[in-house]
Amino acid sequence: MSNQKKSILLPGSFFEKDSQYKLNYLNLKNLHTVYVFDHTVNPVDSKLAMYEIKNAVSALQDYEERNFNIGTAVLNINKRKLDSLITKYLNPFLEIDNFKLGLGIGDNKYQENLPNYSNSLEEVIGYLFENFELSKDSRSLFLGGNSNENIRLMKKYSIGINQWLGSIKQIYKTRDVYKEIKNPKGSISLCLNKDLALENKIIFNDIELIYIIRESSTEDYRSQLDHFFK
């Protein structure tokens, strides 16, 4: 039996309708972590609702029956002033047992990256190491995107890394570098949709798979979970 970690990324309007039912249904699946992302506007359709990342984390934390971890994929460090980022997001998130903290610097792919407070990613990482005990299997840290700079930081701080879609060849290349880390403080993971999953039936077990749940009806939501967690 595979010991591969399988997780999901919640769509922006997840909490608008039937959220309790949907949480109960995903709680039946053998999933590792439920991740939320950090957008102001729904990236699929601006007319759809979009959860605020802190509120989404709180809603998941308040779900008393949960059998899964909670994480961010990813928290945009440049969206808030540094003091607010630390006191309202980083500190509360890492007070949660086994929280999987993904960090990013934002881009303009789905929405204009404004405001941009140009916080230093390396400074934020340093703060986290000074104030929290991090490990791959408990409270952990990873970076969103396998750019050259993120690869450098991954190696320097022995943290995890995530790839958003892209090619299997690229994640395997990143994996080769990640495997050189002796005691990583976070996992290597791949965000993938149904198409990418169908194209690649087998992916190395040490890569966490984060399935992107698309915006859909409650019935289709169930169908997506059933497909990813057979």
What is each model feature region?
Residues 1-65, 139, 213-215, 222-229:
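N-terminal beta1-alpha1-beta2 module of alpha/beta enzyme domains
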Residues 1-3, 26-30, 134-136, 154-156, ...:
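Flexible, charged surface loops at secondary-structure boundaries
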Residues 188-230:
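C-terminal alpha-helical cap/extension of soluble enzyme domains
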Residues 30, 63-68, 92-99, 179-186, ...:
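Structural alpha-beta junctions
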Residues 17-23, 42-45, 78-186:
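Internal, glycine-rich beta/alpha segment that forms the wall or movable "lid"
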Residues 4-13, 32-36, 66-73, 99-103, ...:
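Hydrophobic faces of well-ordered beta-strands that scaffold small-molecule active sites
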Residues 55-84:
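Structural motif corresponding to the early beta-alpha repeats
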